[in-house]
Amino acid sequence: MSTRSRARKRSRVRSRTRRKDPIFVDGHRPRPMYVDYKDLELLSKMVNRQGRIMGRRKSGCTAASQHAVTAAIKRARFMALLPYVGE
């Protein structure tokens, strides 16, 4: 078989769409970066069904906001506002 007769597999180029950081307020980063541990609506979006903290790629957070979210989730777990283990 010649190389021309073979069908070439073309890799699909994905266009990355920027996810909006859920911590940002009106498109701007709050300074200082602080996530309230009592905001259970936001924190429950950052935790999956098993109770694990979602990674940056999945949640769309920047590094600074991911650190703040992680600290807030751990604080809320300690205060018994969020469960350590999910369903």
Curated annotation (Swiss-Prot):
- Name the SUPFAM superfamilies on file: Ribosomal protein S18 (SSF46911)
Note the superkingdom of the native organism: Bacteria
UniProt keywords (A-Z) are: Ribonucleoprotein, Ribosomal protein, RNA-binding, rRNA-binding
Example GO biological process: translation
Entries under InterPro entries matching the protein: Ribosomal_bS18, Ribosomal_bS18_sf
**Subunit composition and interactions:** Part of the 30S ribosomal subunit. Forms a tight heterodimer with protein bS6.
The record's section on HAMAP family has: Ribosomal_bS18
As for family, the record states: Belongs to the bacterial ribosomal protein bS18 family.
Q: What is this protein called?
A: Small ribosomal subunit protein bS18
- Species assigned in the record: Rhodopirellula baltica (strain DSM 10527 / NCIMB 13988 / SH1)
Species lineage:
Bacteria, Pseudomonadati, Planctomycetota, Planctomycetia, Pirellulales
